[in-house]
Amino acid sequence: MSIRILPQEEIQQAASSFHNPPLLYANPKNLYARRAKRLRQLAEHNPFGDYLEFVANIVEVQLDLLENQPIANRVGELTAYLEAHQGVKPLDVKTFKRSDEWQKLLLAFIDKFKPYASDTVLATLEWLEKASNSELEMLADHLLNECYEEVGADKAVFLWAVLSLYWVQLTQQLPRNTKAEYGEERHTCPVCNSAPIASVVHFGETQGLRYLHCSLCESEWNMVRAKCSNCEQTGKLDYWSLDSMDAAVKAESCGDCESYLKVMYQDKDPHVEPIADDLGTLFLDAEMEQKGLARSAINPFLFQVE
C-alpha cells in the first residue's frame, strides 16, 4: 500500500466512502492517554505487572512531550513531496530524511524519565545522553532497518519511543486529501513502511473491519479478515486463545508462511489497545512459539535481539 493526493474532483467521491476508510491516522493525545491507562489496568493482575508499569511511565512521558515540546511544522514540505511523488509511502523509514528534532526529543525524554529509572536503566539513559549525534543517527538507522542486534534491547526501547513520537507527529502534518492505494507490501504501513504491532477488529463506525496498527507512526490500515496479514494467503488460517474462543485477544496463525499476528476485538472488550494488550498476553506468544510459529509483528517494548 502507498498514498497519493486526490485531485479535487475525486475528493467528493472519496468522501462518500469514509464509512470504510482504508487508512486511519492516530489521535496521538488520546492514544497515549488510553495506552497508559490500559497498561496500568492490565498491570494489576499480570505476572509482568512491573514491566507494564514501566512501559506506562514511558508512554506518559511521550504524552508530556507531545503536549509540551511539539515538533516544527513541515506541512508545506510534506505536501510538496507527496504532490511530486504520487503513490509512495511518504514517511518511509528507509528513505525519509529525519531532522535533528528527534534527538532533541530524546534528550528531553531522558531528562523526564530519569526519576522513574532504576540504576540499570539510568546507566542506559546516561549512555544515550552522552552519545554523539552520529552515534544516535547510526543507532536509529539500525533500529528502523530492523538490525536490532546492532542496537541492543536496552537502548532500543527508548530510541523507538522517541522515534515513534517524532513519526506520529509527522503523520498529523500530512495532507488529508489523500487516498491509500492498494498494491504490494500490504503487510507494512502505507505511511512509514513499518511492521504492525497487531490487528484490531473495530466496533462503532468501522464495525467488523480489521485494521493493522503500525508499530512506529501509529497509523492503521485496513486489511480484509479472510487472508493472512503477512503473506495474504487464505487457505490455512487458524485462531488461538488462552482462555476461550470469545477472548478479546487471539493469535491468527498462517500455515502457509508459518507466522502469527495477534488480533484484538473491540466488540469483546472496547478497551483493548495494541501495545498494552500485546504485552498483557505474552503467554499467548509462548504458546505460538511452541507450535513453531514466528511472530510477524513488532512490539517496540519487546525487541528480539539475537
UniProtKB/Swiss-Prot annotation:
Keywords: Cytoplasm. SUPFAM superfamilies: FdhE-like. It is found in: Cytoplasm. Pfam families: FdhE_C, FdhE_central, FdhE_N. Its main location: cytoplasm. The keyword Ribonucleoprotein does not apply. Gene3D superfamilies: FdhE-like domain. GO terms for molecular function: ferric iron binding. One of its GO terms (biological process) is protein maturation. One of its GO terms (cellular component) is cytosol. Necessary for formate dehydrogenase activity. Belongs to the FdhE family. This is Protein FdhE homolog. It comes from Glaesserella parasuis serovar 5 (strain SH0165). The gene is fdhE.
